[in-house]
């Protein structure tokens, strides 16, 4: 049985960033259910927008995005829709439109060869024995058993590591549903949709590489029905759908209290969405995945005597920021307050009507 310093379960943005940062400094093994390349296998349903905080993480690490990760077009505003109030407003945003699956695979490709990575693998069992973490996983057609001093759960909303560490922990969950359609809108756009009759979270749309993606986060029990109902309502706001090219769904966490942020214990750590590090106001998680990976890197390399306590303290600022997102979410999902904010016109950028969308030469108008 092989022994490692660190075993990382999951190679989304959080796990990939941590594996890359620990490479050459600690002996690391990393397991991921995605394939190494291509579109086969698991891919995470996601609107695919890189927030400014995530962009800052790449600046800090000296990384630039390759062109095959960036999607077309780049959109500079979010069309915010209040369905019940029949209000639409445009707010400036500085997101980068990306292909999420290509982004995840690119993040994995940055992990140096010194890290032992198993793609298309399945973690079957974890337990703690003799001050070590033991992991049984299936990869390359057979089961393997390894041990590690530190275990890191970077395995997302349905984290096996979180369930093992906190079997009684309850956090609000939604089913995120997305459908892809051939783009029919004359002007591509990104939208954020609020309808309290459908969900107390929110829905979204994004134009991407010739497709129109429509999705949202809905109650687990009847999410599909609510999603379909909202699609029907959106025709009143000039949303155009047609026949779905692809449908996706996954579980998404929705932290609603301070106790929803859990960081680990007994030399096991949680990063990214597995720790509850996801914005309640936007469901954006990439920036917090990257930030928590950087925080844990610093803790593990120092190897303090009480590493879990050190990680808990080090994430306090991050957790406070995310708690602020919980407060913001409650404001955004309160119908009366949201209606008042949108009607006030604060930060709204009106779109000019009957204005040429392309520059034309003087002769072309003759």
UniProtKB/Swiss-Prot annotation:
Pfam families, per the entry: FAD_binding_3 (PF01494)
InterPro entries (UniProt xref): FAD-bd, FAD/NAD-bd_sf, Geranylgeranyl_reductase
GO molecular function, one term: FAD binding
Domain of life: Bacteria
Family designation: Belongs to the CbrA family.
UniProt cross-references to PANTHER family, sorted A to Z: CONDITIONED MEDIUM FACTOR RECEPTOR 1, GERANYLGERANYL DIPHOSPHATE REDUCTASE
Name of this protein: Protein CbrA
Biological source species: Escherichia coli O9:H4 (strain HS)
